[in-house]
Amino acid sequence: MATAAKTLAAKTDTAVRVRRVQAADIPHVIGLDTRVTKLAKAEYWNDVFRRYGKLRLHERFFLVAENRTDKAKPRVLGFIIGEIRAWEFGSTPCGWVFALSVEPEMRLHGIGSALFEAISSEFKKAGVSKMRTMVARDAPLQLLFFRSEGMMAGPYIQLEKDLD
């Protein structure tokens, strides 16, 4: 199932098109992630593209917000990645978002919301009615964003253990 590209006018003068990732986008995704996280992870992103940009596309979604007009801004203004997961700890099939990033200078312009809306639509078309993500406790900006999109605490508690 192909994701229909959707062109929208974000709250800027930049026309944005949300579409599936392409191989030519990966250097831009790597650059955006490196600028935001201050960590270079090219091997990781190439692997994510291989798994989420090429395989099982009916249940995996790697979408980018493409800059359509402003040559002074980066080509990829943001991305979102998710997949349909089923039966983990008894959960019925649901959409999981595990990555979302927007160019820092383009935040608060509707790009993150456009990406979130696009992946929500893909999950819905694939037949799931619930969407989940995880947010670090010390990431209030991310928490506020996801809450502004209608997400709230779910029925699961994340647990972890150091393995040293």
Please provide the spans of the model-predicted regions.
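Active-site rim helix/loop that mediates acceptor-substrate recognition in acyltransferases
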Residues: 40-62, 68
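Conserved acetyl-CoA-binding loop-helix of GNAT-fold acetyltransferases
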Residues: 108-121, 148
